[in-house]
A protein has these predicted regions:
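Ribonuclease/tRNase effector modules and their secretory precursors
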Residues: 1-80
């Protein structure tokens, strides 16, 4: 997966590692939802004990940004 400069900077700021990204991408089931921006999707997943939100291109080739999941996103992910 390609990582934008913006995403790389956010990863560094927020303590999200390339290894954590790999763990999410290797999950058997990745639930994607719509994002506010056209052409992108939102992935919410738990990795290393915390829930994270990844914004990726619809083709899953590029990570646009990453942040800790909001409370409602975390709840959605728990309910599956």
């Amino acid at each position: 997966m390609n990582i934008t400069k913006h995403a790389f900077e956010r990863m560094r700021e927020r303590g999200f590692t390339v290894e954590m990204l790999g763990k999410i991408l290797r999950m058997k089931t990745i639930r994607r939802g719509p994002s506010k921006e056209e052409g992108s999707s939102r992935i919410v997943a738990k990795v290393d004990g915390s829930y994270w939100t990844l914004i990726v291109t619809d083709d899953m080739k590029t990570l646009i940004t990453v942040r800790r999941a909001h409370e409602d996103e975390e709840q959605e992910a728990r309910e599956g």
